[in-house]
Amino acid sequence: MLATLGFTVTLAVTRGITTVLHKKGAGPNGGIVIGGVHIHHFVFGMVGLIVLGYLWLLLYGFEDKPPRRLFRYTASGYGVCSALILDEFALWLNLRDVYWERQGRESVEALLIFGGILLWGALIYPFALAVWHHFRGHPLPARPR
């Protein structure tokens, strides 16, 4: 659920910022520019996912029962980083900046597919699993709080 929330909020904020920059005529190098090079926001998503992956390895590698709070934070971070990466899916698929061109639609399609998978996992899967167990006569065990 937290990954879905992080994904949705980040997607809305990112699309909002890029739309404002585009409408104000920021040009091809609008946004974050370091040393004359435009840094696309998917770079921050990739770095974030690398850090999260390493953190998950550390959490699983050294503790039998890692703190649930850390998993909540990392789930949110996963959603945030995924939104940053998939918002520019068309860029790394076409190897050129097509964000505002027709091919930019590929990013929207990737976002919808991934968002649907996250929503399914957060909302529909637990319900479907409970219904399945109910009809098979095997109730689900109580979840620890």
Model-derived features: where do they sit?
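Alpha-helical transmembrane segments and their helix-start/interface "positive-inside/aromatic belt" motifs
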Residues: 1-5, 71-72, 106-110
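Alpha-helical transmembrane segments of multi-pass membrane proteins
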Residues: 7-23, 80-87, 122
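Hydrophobic cores of alpha-helical transmembrane segments in multi-pass inner/ER membrane proteins
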Residues: 8, 44-53, 111-123
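Short aromatic-rich membrane-water interface segments that cap or initiate transmembrane helices
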Residues: 31-42, 102-110
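Helix-coil boundary and interhelical linker segments in multi-pass alpha-helical membrane proteins
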Residues: 56-72
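Interfacial helix-loop-helix junctions of multi-pass membrane proteins
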Residues: 90-104
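Primarily interfacial, aromatic-capped hydrophobic alpha-helices that serve as membrane anchors
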Residues: 114-145
